[in-house]
């Protein structure tokens, strides 16, 4: 469960306030006009944007003052944040070991995650050698191996065409269901939100 309590973010003249609860395993679409603060909200929940006041609870634990990697949250940004000099296996492996010194069991986890998103056989390729859709799949695989209870996605598929974007959204929901995870995903398409997600949060 995610609880955002009396949250306030202040950035120069911009102010964002939020107060809501999301039950475990819900799939939430975050909608709102450009500049409303959708990315800021996810960044604040994930620990990347400082709070002026308020609290964030993940499964009953107050994570407001903890580092992003200690919150039980994984976040997928708009550009996917893949490192161009690393292979897809290495990029996904960063979700488990920032040093990439993985055990055999962890290497198998990475392999299974790449298989899950349809990238078996692409393990040794670098991001520049695959399509935009395949890059999005690799970024999703990195989120998958982290096995966090809360997944935040900041318009991760906005650069893709409608058909591929829909495919990636369906894959994301499938991954979330398999992991019993709660997801919040920013989208500009109300049809996507209505078709594939449980609730809509307007910012």
Give the ranges of each region predicted by the language model.
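Helix-to-loop junction immediately C-terminal to a conserved catalytic motif
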Residues: 46
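ABC ATPase NBD coupling module
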Residues: 62-79, 98
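ABC-type ATPase nucleotide-binding domains, specifically the catalytic core motifs of the NBD
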Residues: 66-67, 86, 90-107, 116-117
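Conserved ABC ATPase "signature" region
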Residues: 104-122, 173-174
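Conserved ABC ATPase signature
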Residues: 126-130, 134
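A short, proline-enriched helix->beta-strand linker immediately N-terminal to the Walker B motif
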Residues: 145-149
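Catalytic Walker B motif of ABC-type/P-loop ATPase nucleotide-binding domains
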Residues: 151-155
């Amino acid at each position: 469960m995610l609880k955002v309590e009396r949250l306030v973010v202040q950035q120069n003249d911009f102010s964002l306030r939020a107060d809501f609860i999301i039950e475990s395993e819900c799939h939430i679409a975050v909608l709102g006009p450009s500049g409303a603060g959708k990315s800021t909200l996810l960044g604040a929940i994930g620990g990347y944007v400082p709070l002026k006041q308020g609290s964030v609870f993940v499964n009953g634990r107050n994570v407001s003052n903890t580092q992003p990697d200690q919150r039980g949250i994984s976040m997928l940004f708009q550009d996917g944040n893949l490192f161009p000099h690393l292979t897809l296996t290495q990029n996904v492996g960063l979700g488990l070991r920032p040093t990439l010194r993985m055990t055999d069991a962890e290497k198998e986890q990475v392999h299974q995650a790449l298989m899950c998103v349809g990238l078996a056989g692409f393990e040794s390729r670098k991001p520049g050698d695959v399509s935009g859709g395949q890059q999005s799949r690799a970024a999703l695989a990195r989120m998958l191996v982290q096995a966090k209870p809360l997944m935040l996605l900041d318009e991760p598929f906005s650069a893709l065409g409608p058909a591929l974007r829909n495919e990636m959204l369906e894959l994301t929901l499938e991954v979330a269901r398999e992991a019993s995870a709660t997801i919040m995903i920013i989208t500009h398409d109300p049809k996507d939100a209505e078709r594939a997600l449980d609730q809509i949060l307007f910012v």
